[in-house]
């Protein structure tokens, strides 16, 4: 529990210090990325397809590998670039593309398990469905596709039950994570994608996280 709070505080700090948006998105996916890394074998790789969660990935990389998250922010900005030395295995940001790289890496090395995280809004991209179809039709067993189902796309809400039904029809063992972008009073709905924290927001967020301890 304490480690979980420290990770959230670090993510909050990174967003505030760097005046970065996508706060709600990053908090919705933080636990997923953390949980995946906690269970990965030494040779496994993680690919973040929804690149706007870059800050969440940096915080988790810092936790597990001791690589400074602020250094990753300075080097990559909000969306990660390929940097295998620092545990970033694919450039992402253009939605729907990194999952195709994940499929390729899984096919290229069956001895490795590839974990890839996509977002619900990202499922508007045709390459997502092509990738899921390919995984299923070719029975690729060493790739795990995770979906951050926070219910909010770039400009509108997501029909979650309908999307889950469609995703599972393409890939029955796809892993759905039901999350939310509304982690603090200043993060609500679509605005949680684009809100940039003020000092008051940051202090309120720290207070709420301290109360969770």
Segments (PLM) and residue ranges:
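N-terminal capping segment at the start of a domain
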Residues: 2-20, 148
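Glycine/aspartate-rich loop-and-adjacent alpha/beta segment that forms the canonical ThDP
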Residues: 165-213
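Short acidic, glycine/serine/threonine-rich loops at helix termini
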Residues: 58-61, 127-129, 155-159, 184-190
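Active-site metal-binding loops of divalent metal-dependent hydrolases
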Residues: 117-122, 149-151, 179
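Generic structural signal for well-ordered, non-membrane alpha-helical segments
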Residues: 1-4, 8, 25-29, 50-54, ...
């Amino acid at each position: 529990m304490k480690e979980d709070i420290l990770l959230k505080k670090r993510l909050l700090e990174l967003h505030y210090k760097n005046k970065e948006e996508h706060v709600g998105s990053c908090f919705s996916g933080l636990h997923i990325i953390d949980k995946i890394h906690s269970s990965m074998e030494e040779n496994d790789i993680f690919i973040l397809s929804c690149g706007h969660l870059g800050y969440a990935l940096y915080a988790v990389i810092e936790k597990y590998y001791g690589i400074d998250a602020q250094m990753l922010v300075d080097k990559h900005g909000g969306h990660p670039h390929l940097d295998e030395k620092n545990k970033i295995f694919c450039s992402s940001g253009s939605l729907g593309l990194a999952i195709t790289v994940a499929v390729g890496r899984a096919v290229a090395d069956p001895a490795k398990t590839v974990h890839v995280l996509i977002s619900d809004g990202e499922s508007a991209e045709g390459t997502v469905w092509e990738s899921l179809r390919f995984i299923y039709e070719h029975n690729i067993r060493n790739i795990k596709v995770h979906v951050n189902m926070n219910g909010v796309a770039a400009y509108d809400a997501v029909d979650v039950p309908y999307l889950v039904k469609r995703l599972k029809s393409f890939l029955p063992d796809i892993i759905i994570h039901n999350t939310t972008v509304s982690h603090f009073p200043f993060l609500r709905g679509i605005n949680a994608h684009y809100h940039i924290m003020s000092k008051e927001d940051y202090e309120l967020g720290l207070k709420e996280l301290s109360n969770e301890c």
